């Protein structure tokens, strides 16, 4: 890219997607480049011109904001023949394969090492639906290692939690469409505290990605009014397995102590 195109690209990335919703002239003026530079960059991105780029952005925004009713209508309009079990399973398997294919393994390993570092606390949070993923993660990670905490995505719970968050601690955040302001604000504040943010989001990318060190996008579309969390669950369980492998000596000791406590409390049904 030319210097002007790099300048334009930087402006678009900093102000995405709003930067691309105005006219060519407005974008050129805001980025301090010429109008032909805007058109040329759009063409280099594979579009016939700026209108094509704008159309793609608008389609993406519609997908980001799509609610349960419109999802159901869209899926039902093009549903193939066959039982819903088969159609749903096919979609989920496709999601898993696509998710695994696009995850950067080096980023995954780096995130696991951050979470395995005993010098760092680990926090997790999520939105209305994805908070369940954060809770699942925290429940297991508390066995794997100490100093793991669930952050509820409500503003009155943030200050005490952020007070305990040190520079270098890890925040695992989940945010899928329609993206929640509470999650974005919490991630932003944690990043300002110096936390290392690991974000799990969807193909349309949560705004919280701007504050994440590592970002993993998972496929979520299924023939339903709701997005699927199966691929998120896969990623969470794989992360936990990776951390467990890295900390196994201390984790095994913690598990042995926990099992002894469970046995003493007769927590599980089993031997009399």
Locations of regions flagged by a protein language model:
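Exposed, interaction-prone assembly regions rather than primary DNA-binding/catalytic cores
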Residues: 103-117
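HTH-adjacent hinge/linker in prokaryotic transcriptional regulators
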Residues: 1-10, 14-21, 25-107
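A short, charged, Gly/Pro-tolerant segment at domain boundaries
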Residues: 249-272
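Alpha-helical scaffold segments in soluble metabolic enzymes
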Residues: 7, 11, 40, 52, ...
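Glycine-rich phosphate-binding loops that contact phosphosugars or nucleotide phosphates
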Residues: 113-234, 238-246
